[in-house]
Amino acid sequence: MLKSRLRMFLNELKLLVLTGGGRPRAEPQPRGGRGGGCGWAPFAGCSTRDGDGDEEEYYGSEPRARGLAGDKEPRAGPLPPPAPPLPPPGALDALSLSSSLDSGLRTPQCRICFQGPEQGELLSPCRCDGSVRCTHQPCLIRWISERGSWSCELCYFKYQVLAISTKNPLQWQAISLTVIEKVQIAAIVLGSLFLVASISWLIWSSLSPSAKWQRQDLLFQICYGMYGFMDVVCIGLIIHEGSSVYRIFKRWQAVNQQWKVLNYDKTKDIGGDAGGGTAGKSGPRNSRTGPTSGATSRPPAAQRMRTLLPQRCGYTILHLLGQLRPPDARSSSHSGREVVMRVTTV
């Protein structure tokens, strides 16, 4: 068996050597098609049948099915429709920018949930303007219940809300509390109970006729001092943790009560700035540090009087200080006082 396979292999090797050396080698053709298909004239002695002869020698003379990759001639079929011309990149950027601006101007969004009016009515509860102006009432109530503050964190305006009614006790919801908040609530409750009990006992033992023997005993007098000290400690603890517990109570109240949030009314805002509400502290800071913005609405006489008053006050104060000094010190420091007055005037 092995010998027969070796003989067959040697015979095939001899045949391959003889056929490869006796026939001229075909020139390579371009991939685009047959000889001369790319625009170049075929070489002399080069036949287009060489490739077909090789295929016939390798595959045989029987017809075979050609694959997609082996088709010599392109198949005729419907051409795809031409693609529409693309606009230049600058036009695409301008189109996207204009669409985003139009969508931002036409559809305001809630600054908490980033949803539009389809999720509910949008309110404007504070002085904030721009993209942080609107919010949904349920989103605002939920934010207040999480934060515990009824003022805007940007413009510090206190929300105008109306308490409609308290929910049914069966519908009350618990709020999320941290470990520190639970400890604060426990400290307030225990301190209040101890304070009430100790003060009640002290009042009874000091006023009741039946406790006359207790007031005369030394041990009870020591207890009076200890209870008095613990009462002071409990009062300090309640004062220290009272604000935190009150904030927790306001959070719970925001969840378990029905509210109606009112829109910001500029005419009723006494402490608001004249500009009408930019977010943050820019309004009060500008009103304090920018006198030119408010001076445009004042008459010139009032503006001049306002600028002269600080200078006259400075002169008056320096004059009084100079009169209080002794005569020798006043004469020796006359030049120094002149310098101070000039600096104040500048």
From Swiss-Prot:
Region listing for Disordered, in residue ranges: 20-39, 47-92, 273-301, 326-346
Bias (Polar residues): 284-296
Compartment list: Golgi apparatus membrane; Lysosome membrane
List all Pro residues biased stretches: 77-90
Q: How does it sit in the membrane?
A: Multi-pass membrane protein
UniProt xrefs under Pfam families: RINGv
Where does this protein chiefly localize? Golgi
Q: What class of enzyme is it?
A: transferase
Binding site residues for Zn(2+) 2: C126, C128, C152, C155
Q: Which GO terms describe its cellular component?
A: Golgi membrane; Golgi stack; lysosomal membrane; trans-Golgi network
Q: Where is the composition biased (Basic and acidic residues)?
A: 63-75
Q: How does it assemble?
A: Homodimer.
Kindly provide the name given to this protein in its UniProt entry: E3 ubiquitin-protein ligase MARCHF9
Q: From what organism does this protein derive? A: Homo sapiens (Human)
